[in-house]
Amino acid sequence: MQLDPASGWCQGVRVCRSPNFNARPSGEISLLVIHNISLPPAQFATGKVQEFFQNRLDVTEHPYFAGIADLRVSAHFLIERDGTVTQFVSCLERAWHAGVSSFEGRETCNDFSVGIELEGTDDLPFEDAQYQALTTLTRQLQSTFTAITAQRICGHSDIAPGRKTDPGPAFDWARYRAALAKAALEQEEQR
C-alpha cells in the first residue's frame, strides 16, 4: 500500500467512500487514533461496518442497529480480521470518528487526526494480519504526516476517557509499538 500525499488516498487498499466527512480546518495532521468496531457486536466479516459508514445500514436486520440508526460516523480506515484495509475518507479530510475528544489539552481530535478502526471488540484478541496491516498503514501515515510520532498514537479511550473504551484491553500496544519501531529501523537501513 502507498499513501498519495496529494490526495490523501491509499493505493493498494479497498475504497468504500463515506459521505460522513467534511473539510479539515487548517493545521497539521498530528494524531493517529486506534479504534475497534464490529457490527453486530462481536460478529465479523458481515459487511455491516461498511454499510454503517455509508449510511446504508438496514436497521431492521438486528436489534442493536436500532440504537445506532441516527448516527453519522466514519473513520479513515478499517482493518478487517484478515488484514484487508478499506479506506472511507481521504486523510486530508475530517472523518467523524473521535466525537467529543481531547488530546494534550486540544479539543476536537477529528480536526487533526486520522482514525483507524480495527474489526474487533475490547476483549477478543486481534489477529496477526491486523497487526501487520496496522503497522504498514501506520508507517505510511507517519511518512506523509511526520507529526504523527510514536507518542502521538493513541486509543479512542485515551482521547475520550469515560466515554469510550476502544481499542480495549485485548489490543496489544507493546506488540504494535515494537513492530512500528522495527519497521522504522528497517526503513532507515534501506535508505
Show which residues each predicted segment covers.
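N-terminal catalytic cores of peptidoglycan-degrading enzymes
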Residues: 1-107
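Basic/polar, cationic surfaces and motifs that engage anionic cell-wall
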Residues: 1-9, 107, 112, 121-191
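Residues immediately flanking
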Residues: 36-37, 118, 157
